[in-house]
Amino acid sequence: LNNIITIWQRDSLKSNTISGNRLHPHLKNYNISEKINFTSNLDDLDFDTLTIIAVPSSAISDVLSKCSLRDGKYIIVSKGFDINTGLLSSDLLESNFNIKDDALAILSGPNHAEEIIIGKASAAVIASKNLDYAKELQKLFSSDVFRVYTSPDVIGVQIGAAVKNVIAIASGLCVGLELGDNAQAALVSRGMNEIMSLDTAYSINVRTLYGLSGLGDLI
């Protein structure tokens, strides 16, 4: 692809270092393409095309408030709720930054960057109220080793991705405390049962929670 890609990193030293040696500190065995630009200046970003929001969910509001957002298209890969309002990321962008829901999508799933960049098979779901936009992104991100599915359930995909983290942390504690496979299996299954109960509260499709962004990401 001949797309122009610019990645913002708030730490200017890290941004300049990555730009210079083409290595990410957490992905040192992978050389970053020269076609990818790095900056620590938000004014260098072009919000007229496609913007991928990948900062922590707790920082989205602060970062975007410093940006000159325009009528481009947006995709959120952050997982979680806004720390001040309790809003999901999509609701935050719509209510506080006037981003139209038909120009907004969520990408989520059990995706480890260190596996994706070396070509290991992975899958994700892209959710948007605008299915044409979701399919457009599906085509953009799909490859022979990265399978992308689409969904209209924007809220369900975000709820599954955020809430499953609580169970994932507890599952890790089971391992660390050596409580055994029985306890871990019981915790995960009962935890999923609690997550399922959110379908009514948020008016979401329970099948979404069993999908890639919920159960898939938990596993």
What residue ranges belong to the model's regions?
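Short phosphate-binding/catalytic loops that engage adenosine nucleotides
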Residues: 3, 72, 146
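Conserved N-terminal Rossmann-fold NAD(P) cofactor-binding segment
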Residues: 3-49, 61
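Conserved SAM-binding loop
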Residues: 7, 52-53, 126
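Cofactor-binding loop segments of dinucleotide-utilizing enzymes, especially the Rossmann-like FAD-
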Residues: 10, 79, 129
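Rossmann-like NAD(P)(H) cofactor-binding subdomain of soluble oxidoreductases
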Residues: 32-35, 39-121, 137
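Alpha-helix C-terminal capping/helix-to-coil transition sites in glycosyltransferase folds
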Residues: 44-48, 163, 215
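Internal alpha-helical scaffold of NAD(P)-dependent oxidoreductase catalytic cores
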Residues: 96-104, 121-169, 173-208
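C-terminal substrate-binding/catalytic lobe of Rossmann-fold NAD(P)-dependent oxidoreductases
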Residues: 203-219
